[in-house]
Swiss-Prot record:
Pfam families xref list: GIPC1_GH1, GIPC1_GH2, PDZ
GO cellular component, one term: presynapse
Tissue/organ expression: Widely expressed.
Protein name stated in the entry: PDZ domain-containing protein GIPC1
Compositionally biased intervals (Basic residues): 1-11
Length: 333
């Protein structure tokens, strides 16, 4: 069917200049949030978890980002299970874990743990710290935020655009979890739902954000960053294989993405940020996987509808994704 002829539900871009990040879910955790949204891949048939004896026995080292002894965790197949294992190792409630970074204790958004973990990656868990409420006057349509989520019900700030409305409010920082907007709880919401709410707030009015920042060690208390930058932090992990976490079905050990796939994923993630105000490398990876063998944009659109229909991607976005995958295939970077 030609693209755009009633093949799926239509929706305008959630965020035009504002950004929302593809959730860290990278695991497609398909739980409906308070706003009625649901995780990607919810329509797929669920597979029973494999017997424990058949799961790959992989042991990872972990620390709390603000400082702790080193723990060892194993036997998880998705982000929620991972957070549970970390909580057990450090005797914390699982709900205290906000997100994890790989190979750095810093709040580095380029090192967020998504749906893949290198076999020698070191996991740093960032837990809840100080809570704060901030009043924001929406003087412009775009607030300058990029939102992501952790795949387990928490949406947080991944990037703050320089010179934006939010950039002028020093109390708001990258890594802050968005608990509520004007008293409406966002716990359990996906990144794109939070981005939509922020976009729909009326211009020229004040709204209240309830935030929780990651707990900081003394050496981490400094001027806030506008977001991660490539190359920051030590590279502790050297394993070439990755453990891919899934919300349905077993975790699998896979090779790292090819150069083409890495570049295509990066470009699609940029498109997600531009169109929807979200960043989500795992969502981008899923889209590249769906599109790399398709012959035309219509086939890609049908595949996206079938697998990721809840996102209701606009036609122009699908065309740009098709173009990004095609450019990466022929080396046009």
């Amino acid at each position: 069917m030609p693209l755009g002829l009633g093949r799926r539900k239509k929706a305008p871009p959630l965020v035009e200049n504002e950004e929302a990040e593809p959730s860290r879910s990278g695991l497609g955790v398909g739980e409906p949030g308070p706003l009625g949204g649901s995780g990607a891949g919810e329509s797929q048939m669920g597979l029973p978890p494999p017997p424990a004896s058949l799961r790959p026995r992989l042991v990872f080292h972990t620390q709390l980002a603000h400082g702790s002894p080193t723990g060892r965790i194993e036997g998880f197949t998705n982000v929620k299970e991972l957070y549970g294992k970390i909580a057990e190792a450090f005797r914390l409630p699982a709900a205290e874990v906000m997100f994890c970074t790989l190979n750095t204790h810093k709040v580095d958004m380029d090192k967020l743990l998504g749906g893949q973990i290198g076999l020698e990656d070191f996991i740093f868990a960032h837990v809840k710290g100080q809570r704060k409420e901030v009043e924001v006057f929406k003087s412009e349509d775009a607030l300058g935020l990029t939102i992501t989520d952790n795949g387990a019900g928490y949406a947080f700030i991944k990037r703050i655009k320089e010179g934006s409305v939010i950039d002028h409010i020093q109390l708001i920082s990258v890594g802050d979890m968005i608990e509520a907007i004007n008293g409406q709880s966002l716990l359990g919401c996906r990144h794109y739902e939070v981005a939509r709410l922020l976009k729909e707030l009326p211009r020229g009015r004040t709204f209240t954000l309830k935030l929780t920042e990651p707990r900081k060690a003394f050496d981490m208390i400094s001027q806030r960053s506008s977001g991660g930058h490539p190359g920051s932090g030590p590279q502790l992990g050297t394993g070439r294989g990755t453990l891919r976490l899934r919300s349905r079905g077993p975790a699998t050990v896979e090779d790292l993405p090819s150069a083409f796939e890495e570049k295509a994923i990066e470009k699609v993630d940029d498109l997600l940020e531009s169109y929807m105000g979200i960043r989500d490398t795992e969502l981008a990876a899923t889209m590249v996987e769906l599109g790399k063998d398709k012959r035309n944009p219509d086939e890609l659109a049908e595949a996206l509808d079938e697998r990721l229909g809840d996102f209701a991607f606009p036609d122009e976005f699908v065309f740009d994704v098709w173009g990004a995958i095609g450019d990466a295939k022929v080396g046009r970077y």
